[in-house]
From Swiss-Prot:
Pathway: Metabolic intermediate biosynthesis; chorismate biosynthesis; chorismate from D-erythrose 4-phosphate and phosphoenolpyruvate: step 4/7
Family: Belongs to the shikimate dehydrogenase family.
Source domain of life: Bacteria
Gene name tied to this protein: ydiB
Organism per entry: Shigella flexneri
Xref: SUPFAM superfamilies: Aminoacid dehydrogenase-like, N-terminal domain, NAD(P)-binding Rossmann-fold domains
Protein name: Quinate/shikimate dehydrogenase
Pfam family, one: SDH_C
Family annotation (CDD domains): NAD_bind_Shikimate_DH
Keyword line: Amino-acid biosynthesis, Aromatic amino acid biosynthesis, NAD, NADP, Oxidoreductase
GO MF annotation list: quinate 3-dehydrogenase (NAD+) activity; quinate 3-dehydrogenase (NADP+) activity; shikimate 3-dehydrogenase (NAD+) activity; shikimate 3-dehydrogenase (NADP+) activity
Residues noted as binding substrate in the record, renumbered to the chain: K71, D107
InterPro entries in UniProt: Aminoacid_DH-like_N_sf, NAD(P)-bd_dom_sf, Quinate/Shikimate_DH, SDH_C, Shikimate_DH-bd_N, Shikimate_DH_fam
Residues that hold NAD(+) according to the record: A132, G133, G134, A135, N155, R156, R157, D158, K205, C232, V233, Y234, N235, G255
Length: 288
């Protein structure tokens, strides 16, 4: 790719950042489409995020992706949020229109699209959702919008717990989906929830390198063959949770699906063009 002064810059702001496949994926897509943009990753944490946003405006960047730990904080630094992003309380995409920043969340649409592409109909189904950060809440919100009957959130009683309760209340008030939030330490409640669930989704970073030997499911017998197990983590490709699920006879969807579909939507938001989906699947080796 020959980058010239006519190229516009798109970023990714996250910490840590080196594990991300987004720069490779987006740059391959941009080059294939022949578009005058380049995508770069920037190591940005909560403390440096405000300054990074000022830099985005000053450099007239087209926009940026936002990942952990900045997804919720980023809502405070945009001029407009989509209705879905308001429901989530977190964004993963910022589009810069001449200094006016719009915030979107494509995590939820990406993950639900990956589930649908597998042939699974979520309408009327029950999901057990692990975590209450930006990815989890995005998936929960989009799932509720698209027809999930019930979402059972399980997360540790940490700094996200009160935010999870507030998220559950927003979804309950604005959709027909029933959302509950339970401390993950309550393993009896967790076991009972899994027994009647249709989908188990890991929206946490548990299982991501260098913690690839970890899983929030401590007992593989809690997983049953009728359960669809989906993952947000894609590094490693086969997380411990997915290994457990396959051993238990569950159908699984890896983190590449969410990465691909959320990235496709981001691409269109930034460029106004269609994402070269089949090409990217081939060159990135996603295969699904």
């Amino acid at each position: 790719m020959d980058v010239t002064a006519k190229y516009e810059l798109i970023g990714l702001m996250a910490y840590p950042i080196r594990h991300s496949l987004s720069p490779e994926m987006q740059n391959k897509a941009l080059e294939k489409a022949g578009l005058p943009f380049t995508y770069m990753a920037f190591e940005v944490d909560n403390d440096s995020f405000p300054g990074a946003i000022e830099g985005l405006k000053a450099l007239k960047m087209r926009g940026t992706g936002v990942s952990m730990p900045n997804k919720q904080l980023a809502c405070e630094y945009v001029d407009e949020l989509t209705p879905a992003a308001k429901l989530v309380g977190a964004i993963n995409t910022i589009v810069n229109d001449d200094g006016y920043l719009r915030g979107y969340n494509t995590d939820g649409t990406g993950h639900i699209r990956a589930i649908k592409e597998s042939g699974f109909d979520i309408k009327g189904k029950t999901m057990v959702l692990l975590g209450a950060g930006g990815a989890s809440t995005a998936i929960g919100a989009q799932g509720a919008i698209e027809g999930l009957k019930e979402i059972k959130l399980f997360n540790r009683r940490d700094e996200f717990f009160d935010k999870a309760l507030a998220f559950a209340q927003r979804v309950n008030e604005n959709t027909d989906c029933v959302v509950t939030d339970t401390d993950l330490a309550d393993q009896q409640a967790f076991a009972e929830a899994l027994a009647s669930a249709d989908i188990l989704t890991n929206g946490t970073k548990v299982g991501m390198k260098p913690f690839e030997n970890e899983s929030l499911v401590n007992d593989i017998s809690l997983l049953h063959p009728g359960l669809l197990v989906t993952e947000c983590v894609y590094n490693p490709h086969m997380t411990k949770l997915l290994q457990q699920a396959q051993q238990a006879g569950c159908k699984t969807i890896d983190g590449y699906g969410m990465l691909l579909w959320q990235g496709a939507e981001q691409f269109t938001l930034w460029t106004g063009k269609d994402f070269p989906l089949e090409y990217v699947k081939q060159v990135m080796g996603f295969g699904a």
